[in-house]
Amino acid sequence: MKRETVQVLLEALPYIKEFHGKTFVIKFGGSAMKNENAKEAFIKDLVLLKYTGINPVIVHGGGSEISSLMNQLGIEPVFKNGYRITDEKTMEIVEMVLVGKVNKDIVMNINLHGGKAIGVCGKDGELLLAEKETKYGDIGYVGKVKKVDTTLIKGLLVEGYIPVIAPIGFGEDGTSYNINADIVAAEIAKSLEVEKLVLLTDVDGVFKDGKLLPILSSKEAEDLIEKNIVKGGMIPKLQCAISAVNSGVKSVHIINGGVEHALLLEIFSKEGIGTMIKNLEV
């Protein structure tokens, strides 16, 4: 057992050296948030990344918590094309749950495990200027990112904090917007020009003919979408990945957040456990 431990450390060493001082944006959601064991493992992984000299920036979701509170209040959640239809009352609930509960729970868990986290949302420091998402008609206060101001994030990283970001943006008139967490993570990753964007999902990665694809170029990822090989919720995640790598992010990783220590297994091992998207042509 001791020799196995040494071997694991030796395998991780070149990656620790390579990524020391680099910034990763990690989208935390899905199974990793719902499964308590996976959640605790993720928090421990995060703190370990920080202690190895990597700068993690967390963007979180919280859809199940929002729906749970809505149901308790007698409000039925309604979705259109994967987006939560967000009227004024729903927007209040979304902001209350994401900013007031989910964000602070994550921050406290990181701090309890030896990290130093600060929770913010897109309104803080004018981080996420948003505008109404109209692609699928009027779906209420659902937004898309218009501009990212990374000043606050950079300041927190310099001071040694782990930023934890709730995906609530603000309009030019001060209106609050609910924004998809994958999109927020990708836009922040692009603005910071980070080393890695990691998207935690409920599946092991991207599949073709029943087989996990460990690595894809952005062109190959585009082909999978165009040929209808990937479907459902994986399409917007791949679109985020393609946009990120085409805008300067070195690589994007789509991994199963329900697997304990998925983050470390993907980043610090040769094989990884999910799908990595990068510009292989460069």
From Swiss-Prot:
It catalyses: N-acetyl-L-glutamate + ATP = N-acetyl-L-glutamyl 5-phosphate + ADP. The record marks K27, K237 as: Transition state stabilizer. One of its GO terms (molecular function) is ATP binding. Belongs to the acetylglutamate kinase family. ArgB subfamily. SUPFAM superfamilies: Carbamate kinase-like. The keyword Amino-acid biosynthesis applies. This is Acetylglutamate kinase. HAMAP family: ArgB (MF_00082). InterPro entries: AceGlu_kinase-like_sf, AcgluKinase_fam, ArgB, Asp/Glu/Uridylate_kinase, NAGK-C. Pathway: Amino-acid biosynthesis; L-arginine biosynthesis; N(2)-acetyl-L-ornithine from L-glutamate: step 2/4. One of its GO terms (cellular component) is cytoplasm. Disulfide bonds: none annotated. Catalyzes the ATP-dependent phosphorylation of N-acetyl-L-glutamate. Keywords: Amino-acid biosynthesis, Arginine biosynthesis, ATP-binding, Cytoplasm, Kinase, Nucleotide-binding, Transferase. Its main location: cytoplasm. Its EC number is 2.7.2.8. Gene3D superfamilies: Acetylglutamate kinase-like. One of its GO terms (biological process) is arginine biosynthetic process via ornithine. PANTHER family: N-ACETYLGLUTAMATE SYNTHASE, N-ACETYLGLUTAMATE SYNTHASE, MITOCHONDRIAL. NCBIfam families: argB. It is found in: Cytoplasm. It comes from Kosmotoga olearia (strain ATCC BAA-1733 / DSM 21960 / TBF 19.5.1). Substrate binds at G62, G63, R84, N178.
